[in-house]
């Protein structure tokens, strides 16, 4: 068996990669993939076509003398080099490619810039670590010899420092554990060989367990964390030593009773083997139950520790007995004298004599310490795990000197909708949502497409737009006031035009009457002398002369009047040519044509020819010869007829119709002129009234723009045409996804992003944003958040859920195994209760030491791990103590308690000291979480060892008596070997127990 273990411990580690290498290959995810913050990060990355990497490195560039042009040249060079490193850099936020980021990435004092970089690989993976080292080298090489100082920090730097610290601390922790175990084992056994036996089993167990965990990680993909590696070493050292102490102590006890060494090994295995098996089962099953936790820190640590416990158990029941069998015949592991037996016997005697006092005193102390646990404030800031001298810690300190911590750790509010949000209504609803979020106490700024600078766009505020309209209305009102004289003149001119058109109508009527007479006369001439008729056919000269003379008089009278009335013709024609009323009225249009012909007749001399004809006719007298008159008249008539044809008077009927049309047109023109004048007057009056109204509206809108400029009063409106502008598209690129379905807002708070207040604020922001959804275009949108406070919120929520699971699984497993081991119900209940109060006392003491005296909050992961270890290890001691009580119960209640305390006090104390020493080795770590965990688990084991198992449980067992074993009767089923041991007790011991019993009765 020894050879098998040696071969296993040597060969197995050579067959698989080291556990440290597997920790790099399969790092622990902080949160499960379905965590809200993780889902939000992936959703935002997919929507904006970004890397979605949470592996962020922040480069801080400072120049305490002030950043200048030379510094910006170095910055430019660094950005170019990082962009060329596509293997390590997947994202870069700089203000060279995105100028609006200059304000965000630069400090207010003008002395520092930050450069966020997304590294390749998942956080904590070897790829991420190599990317970190390459980028760090580029940064240092670029700023070397310049006025800039570079610091690297951020999550990627913190994880890298934690990895380096874990590797650096592992050797010192294991060395410290080994030294303390050697010292304690030497004090306990005072035998070098016996002292080395637990170390041999621990060494073989540790090498085998680490190889097995690495193999499971290699084959099954089990994630391995630095915490798991450190705790695996500590748990194997503690549990393996406990199991060895249990077995060796019982072996020594049988040897003292005279058993042969080999027989003593057999009987020790039969006696304590079930306790070791029950203890290992309790711890192992509890650790396996942690596999169902959501947080990686629990779900990955649990299986690794369960493997370690299983290997330790197998080594304790196979390797250690084999070594004892080989070493015992030679006397190498012979027991030394029992120095502490008398002390523990007296301690048991005092307890059974005054069980209430001891129980009360122990409970008061435990409750007092446990009450301090209620003062605990948990830390979620991983930066505080590292010493201040680590590079990432130095970087954070330098960054906080120039930037607020919340400025460098942003949060994003993500709104995802099934439809495009790039609409006026969608943007207005988004602004309303952002406005509500910005009013939450503790929210310093909300940046987004509707508020790029943290405030609502002034140009998009409805009140601003109203003010602009008011200004323009005011200008229009002032223009109307200034043009009042022009309006009055317009009205006067319209009235004057109407009056003139009325006069024109009268003149046209008179002219038409004269022209009508002319037409009649000309028609008569045409009938009498036109056509095929000739003057040769006229046989009545006297009659002809008389008629000609009369016609001349008529023409003279009519055409003298017409000629005198044509002064108005030019103005009338000009008015008709520019009149829209005449354009729309056919009759007026016809009249206008006739007026044009009259104007033409006047201008080309046609009317003058008619007047000349009239005079010639009047001058016809009887003395003239008919031949002369006829010749002259013929020439004149031919000329007049040709001219009249140009006027359209060659057809008397058509001429009369046109004259009627002209008359009607003049009437319509005069009527329309009056209507226009009345309309102009009304328009002028209404325009003046409008000016008054515009002035009032302008005053109201300008007051709105000035007095209602606060965001809550301003309203929001983006005109559709703005959405197509290049400026809007440039701003929207950072906040709206290319398809327009996802919008994000950058949220900056006044709170420490690592505080519980910031975590609570996340829920408040989401609830407020969802409260702005009903009855808007965002009603069907999903709202989520991403960022470090959101991730910490999820960690806290999952932690609370996992703690409930861990507590339930641990308590149920411990109770069931204790019930199976003790075949009772009552004893397991108060034994588990004692373990729980021991755990709470350890947490309370940790709060006092770290939080009160050292000013450090407990890391959130410490209580969960401490609970599992303390309850499981406490169950080990419980099982050893309770099983011995049951086995010794044939002696009576008080005697069995004294006997049990005497026989197990030294064993439990030794085991407790050894386990506490192994946990105390964690105090040599440079990682704060490991130190806190080691201290709390260590002092918890000491409390359990020296108070709970030594005082509280024996006093409780004494008070309850046989009721502890209800419903069974263990005193009637005492183990045969234990009965033989009792029969071999010395007479002196029996006398002491009898005296104690008699004293108790009295």
From Swiss-Prot:
Keywords: Cell inner membrane, Cell membrane, Lipid transport, Membrane, Transmembrane, Transmembrane helix, Transport
Keyword Transmembrane helix on entry: yes
Keyword presence, Cell inner membrane: yes
Transmembrane segments: 1-21, 177-197, 199-219, 228-248, 268-288, 306-326, 358-378, 806-826, 835-855, 862-882, 901-921, 923-943
Gene null: resulting phenotype: Deletion mutant accumulates important amounts of DAT and is devoid of PAT. DAT only accumulates inside the cells and is not exported to the cell surface.
InterPro entries: MMPL_dom (IPR004869), MmpL_fam (IPR004707), Mycobact_MmpL (IPR050545)
One Pfam family hit: MMPL
Location in or out of the cell: Cell inner membrane
Membrane topology classification: Multi-pass membrane protein
One BP annotation, GO: lipid transport
Any one cellular-component term (Gene Ontology): plasma membrane
Matches recorded under PANTHER family: MEMBRANE PROTEIN MJ1562-RELATED, MEMBRANE PROTEIN YDGH-RELATED
Family per similarity comment: Belongs to the resistance-nodulation-cell division (RND) (TC 2.A.6) family. MmpL subfamily.
Physiological role: Required for the biosynthesis of polyacyltrehalose (PAT) and the transport of diacyltrehalose (DAT) and possibly PAT to the cell surface.
Protein name (database record): Acyltrehalose exporter MmpL10
Organism: Mycobacterium tuberculosis (strain ATCC 25618 / H37Rv)
């Amino acid at each position: 068996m020894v050879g098998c273990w040696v071969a296993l411990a040597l060969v197995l580690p050579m067959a698989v990669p080291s556990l440290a290498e597997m920790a790099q290959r399969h790092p622990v995810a902080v949160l499960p993939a379905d965590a809200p913050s993780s889902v939000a990060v992936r959703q935002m990355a997919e929507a904006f076509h970004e890397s979605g990497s949470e592996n962020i490195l922040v480069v801080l560039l400072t120049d305490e003398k002030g950043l200048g042009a030379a510094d910006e040249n170095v910055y430019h060079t660094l950005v170019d080099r990082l962009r060329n490193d596509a293997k390590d850099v997947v994202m870069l936020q700089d203000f060279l490619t995105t100028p609006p980021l200059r304000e965000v990435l630069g400090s207010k004092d003008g002395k520092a810039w930050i450069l966020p970089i997304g590294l390749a690989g998942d956080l904590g993976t070897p790829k991420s670590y190599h990317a970190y080292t390459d980028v760090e080298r580029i940064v240092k090489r670029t700023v070397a010899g310049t006025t800039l100082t570079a610091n690297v920090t951020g999550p990627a730097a913190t994880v890298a420092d934690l990895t380096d610290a874990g590797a650096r601390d592992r050797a010192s922790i294991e060395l410290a554990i080994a030294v303390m175990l050697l010292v304690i084992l030497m004090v306990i056994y005072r035998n070098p060989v016996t002292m080395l036996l637990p170390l041999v089993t621990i060494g073989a167990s540790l090498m085998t367990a680490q190889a097995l965990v690495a193999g499971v990680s290699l084959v099954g993909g089990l994630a391995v964390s630095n915490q798991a590696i450190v705790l695996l070493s500590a748990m194997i050292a503690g549990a393996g030593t406990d199991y060895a102490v249990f077995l060796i102590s019982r072996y020594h006890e049988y040897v003292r009773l005279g058993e042969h060494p080999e027989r003593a090994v057999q009987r020790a295995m039969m006696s304590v083997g079930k306790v070791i098996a029950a203890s290992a089962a309790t711890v192992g099953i509890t650790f396996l139950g942690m596999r169902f936790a959501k947080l990686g820190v629990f779900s990955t640590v649990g299986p690794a520790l369960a493997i370690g416990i299983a290997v330790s158990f197998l080594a304790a029941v196979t390797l250690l007995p084999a070594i004892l069998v080989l070493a015992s015949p030679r006397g190498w592991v012979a027991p030394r004298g029992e120095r502490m037996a008398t002390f523990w016997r007296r301690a048991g005697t005092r307890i059974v004599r005054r069980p209430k006092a001891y129980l009360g005193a122990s409970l008061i102390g435990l409750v007092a310490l446990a009450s301090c646990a209620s003062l605990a404030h948990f830390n979620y800031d991983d930066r505080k795990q590292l010493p201040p001298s680590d590079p990432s810690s130095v970087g954070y300190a330098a960054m906080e000197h120039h930037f607020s911590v919340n400025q460098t750790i942003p949060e994003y509010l993500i709104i995802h909708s099934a439809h495009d949000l790039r609409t006026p209504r969608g943007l207005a609803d988004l602004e309303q949502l952002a406005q509500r979020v910005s009013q939450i106490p503790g929210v310093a700024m909300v940046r987004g497409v509707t508020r790029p600078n943290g405030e609502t766009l002034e140009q998009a505020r409805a009140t601003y737009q109203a003010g602009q309209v008011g200004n323009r209305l005011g200008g229009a009102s002032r223009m109307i006031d200034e043009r009042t004289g022009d309006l009055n003149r317009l009205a006067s001119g319209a009235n004057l035009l109407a009056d003139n058109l009325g006069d024109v109508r009268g003149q046209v009527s008179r002219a038409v009457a004269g022209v009508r007479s002319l037409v009649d006369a000309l028609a008569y001439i045409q009938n009498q002398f036109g056509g095929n008729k000739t003057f040769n056919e006229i046989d009545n000269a006297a009659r002809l002369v008389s008629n000609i003379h009369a016609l001349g008089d008529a023409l003279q009278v009519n055409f003298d009047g017409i000629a005198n009335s044509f002064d108005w013709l030019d103005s009338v024609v000009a008015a008709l040519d520019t009149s829209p009323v005449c354009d729309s009225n056919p009759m007026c249009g016809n009249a206008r044509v006739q007026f044009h012909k009259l104007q033409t007749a006047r201008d080309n001399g046609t009317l003058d020819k008619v007047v000349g004809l009239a005079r010639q006719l009047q001058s016809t007298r009887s003395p003239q010869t008919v031949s002369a008159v006829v010749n002259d008249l013929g020439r004149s008539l031919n000329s007049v007829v040709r001219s009249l044809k140009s006027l359209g008077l060659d057809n008397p009927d058509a001429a009369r119709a046109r004259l009627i049309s002209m008359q009607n047109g003049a009437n319509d023109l005069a009527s329309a002129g009056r209507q226009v004048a009345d309309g102009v007057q009304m328009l002028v009056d209404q325009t003046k009234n409008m000016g008054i109204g515009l002035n009032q509206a302008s005053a109201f809108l300008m007051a709105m723009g000035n007095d209602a400029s606060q965001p809550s009063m301003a309203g929001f409106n983006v005109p559709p045409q703005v959405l197509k502008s290049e400026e809007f598209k440039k701003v929207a690129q950072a906040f709206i996804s290319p398809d327009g379905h996802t919008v994000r807002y950058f949220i900056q708070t006044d709170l420490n992003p690592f505080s519980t207040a910031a975590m609570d604020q996340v829920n408040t922001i989401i609830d407020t944003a969802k409260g702005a959804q009903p009855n808007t275009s965002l009603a069907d949108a999903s709202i989520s958040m991403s960022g470090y406070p959101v991730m910490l919120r999820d960690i806290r929520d999952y932690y609370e859920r996992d703690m409930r699971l861990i507590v339930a699984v641990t308590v149920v497993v411990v109770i069931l195994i204790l019930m199976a081991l003790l075949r009772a119900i009552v004893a397991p209940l108060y034994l588990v209760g004692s373990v729980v109060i021991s755990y709470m006392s350890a947490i309370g003491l940790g709060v006092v030491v770290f939080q009160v005296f050292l000013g450090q909050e407990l890391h959130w992961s410490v209580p969960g791990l401490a609970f599992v270890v303390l309850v499981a290890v406490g169950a080990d001691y419980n099982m050893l103590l309770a099983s011995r009580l049951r086995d010794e119960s044939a002696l009576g209640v008080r005697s069995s308690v004294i006997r049990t305390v005497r026989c197990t006090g030294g064993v439990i104390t030794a085991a407790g000291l050894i386990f506490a020493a192994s946990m105390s080795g964690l105090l040599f770590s440079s990682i704060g979480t490991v130190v806190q965990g080691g201290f709390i688990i260590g002092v918890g084991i000491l409390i359990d060892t020296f108070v709970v198992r030594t005082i509280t449980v024996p006093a409780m067992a004494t008070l309850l008596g046989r009721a502890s074993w209800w419903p069974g009767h263990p005193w009637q089923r005492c183990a045969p070997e234990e009965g033989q041991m009792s029969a071999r007790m010395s007479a002196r011991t029996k006398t002491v127990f009898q005296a104690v019993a008699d004293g108790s009765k009295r």
